Amino acid sequence: MEDEPGSENEADTIVASPLAKWRIEFSKSFQNYLDRSAPNIVRRWLVTLVAAVIYIYRVYSVYGYFVISYGLATYILNLLIGFLSPKVDPELEALDPDSLPVDESDEYKPFVRRLPEFKFWYAATKAFVVAFVMTFFSFLDVPVFWPILLCYWLVLYSLTMKRLIVHMFKYRYFPFDVRKPVKLLKFLVNSVLTFLRLKKGDGGDDRPSSSNSSQGNEKQD
């Protein structure tokens, strides 16, 4: 008796369905976690900092995998450039007459990053995790004189950042909102001044009470 052609497909579907179901549930849970962590910028970057420290300690302890470290540093630099660069290059807008601003209000547009902060964080964190896993495979430990890679990366970093800074000054944009640190500084200063005033007021209230008590003692005498 020959098996029906559809029986094998049904069996494969039955076997694969639990795995596919688990994959879908894991994907939803992970995406839910990412969505909930989006507002917590400081906590997210602290996690990335911990991952970076663990990776650096791993490379330092085994004293190897310098090519992987060079690739990781170059990739992080590329992400940083995307994070600091505008989504639309002003140089290309200047060459296109159709994209020129019609009125003066269009000249001051909000800075939109080519790579948003959340995507920058996610890609950087994933890069550190992947690089850490790669350090457990000995065939990836290519022998190389690491000071050459370090010098080459420093030169690459200097040239890239110099070009980016010149581009910022030329087209008059700044990738950070300076108003938020100023508001935070004002809040901290006002909080300290309010605390000092309250403390001074408490001290002033204590002085009359002490003087009144001394006058009462004199009257009793």
Swiss-Prot record:
Biased amino acid composition, Polar residues: 209-221
Keyword line: Membrane, Transmembrane, Transmembrane helix
Pfam families from the UniProt entry: Rer1
Localisation: Membrane
Keyword Transmembrane: yes
Keyword RNA-binding: no
Chain intervals for the UniProt region annotation (Disordered): 200-221
Coiled-coil boundaries: none
Stretch forming the signal peptide: none
Transmembrane regions: 41-58, 64-84, 128-148, 149-169
Main subcellular location of this protein, as a coarse class: membrane
A GO-annotated cellular component: cytoplasm
Topology class, membrane: Multi-pass membrane protein
Family from the record: Belongs to the RER1 family.
Function: Involved in the retrieval of endoplasmic reticulum membrane proteins from the early Golgi compartment.
The protein's name: Protein RER1D
Organism per entry: Arabidopsis thaliana
